[in-house]
């Protein structure tokens, strides 16, 4: 009887050990799929940082035609990029240099497809467009005559919203693939910044590990969808 009880007890202990191992394995798998932690913060600071205008501000919207450089050829965009990365957007900020509006994305790299950047790096990516106070635009372009219908007080409370035709607004937590180049030394942007090769080199996650490229041709915007594996093959 005593031997039977000991055998029964040993079986129970063995079951707990097996279940515990399975739970540990599950926890390990879950942790490997958790959000990537920050390895290196390579982001840059801004001298000017504009908030999204409030409801009391006037906003004038300007739309620019898209850059048609290689816009239909993702493989070509990848080939001329310094880095191709998958990222999660951590922050979106608006600034300007020499009267030109820029949007700064601070992004956390979750995968690297090309280049020397590492998973866990945080970098700053600059895109043309965004919000800029009208007064800053006028100071940079000396074109107050274009806004002669506005009073001095109205100019102070007016923002320009500059966008590329057909481009989707990026938001915090967006999952993107970016084709980037390091900003050149003669650029007004901060040292250590990155820029998109083209707005079509910014692809948006669309579920099931697929990404969408937006292409504007004349007045129409079309979408091309790629699997993540297909994009990886283009970088090989």
Regions found by a protein language model. Give the residues of each.
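Sec-dependent N-terminal signal peptides of Gram-positive bacterial secreted proteins and lipoproteins
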Residues: 1-27
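Short coil-to-beta-strand transition motifs
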Residues: 76-86
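Netrin-like (NTR/C345C) domain of secreted extracellular proteins
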Residues: 20-57, 138-236
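Short glycine/threonine/proline-enriched tight-turn/helix- or strand-capping micro-motif at secondary-structure
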Residues: 59-76
């Amino acid at each position: 009887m005593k031997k039977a009880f000991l055998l029964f007890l040993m079986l129970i202990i063995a079951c707990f050990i097996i279940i515990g191992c399975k739970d540990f394995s599950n926890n390990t798998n879950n942790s490997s799929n958790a959000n990537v932690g920050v390895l290196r913060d390579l982001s840059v600071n801004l001298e000017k940082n504009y908030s999204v205008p409030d409801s009391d501000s006037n906003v004038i919207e300007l739309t620019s035609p898209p850059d048609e450089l290689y816009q239909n050829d993702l493989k070509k965009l990848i080939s001329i990029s310094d880095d191709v990365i998958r990222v999660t957007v951590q922050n979106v900020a608006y600034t300007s240099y020499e009267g030109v509006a820029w949007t700064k994305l601070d992004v956390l790299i979750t995968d690297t497809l090309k280049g020397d950047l590492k998973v866990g790096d945080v970098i700053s990516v600059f895109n043309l467009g965004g919000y800029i106070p009208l007064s800053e635009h006028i100071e940079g372009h000396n074109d107050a005559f274009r806004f002669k219908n506005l009073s001095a007080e109205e100019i102070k409370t007016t923002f320009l919203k500059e966008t590329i035709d057909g481009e989707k607004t990026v938001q915090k937590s967006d999952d993107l693939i970016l084709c980037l180049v390091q900003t050149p030394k003669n650029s007004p942007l901060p040292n250590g910044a990155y820029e998109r090769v083209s707005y079509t080199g910014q692809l948006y996650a669309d579920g099931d590990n697929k990404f969408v490229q937006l292409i504007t041709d004349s007045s129409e915007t079309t979408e091309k969808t790629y699997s993540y594996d297909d994009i990886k093959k283009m970088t090989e």
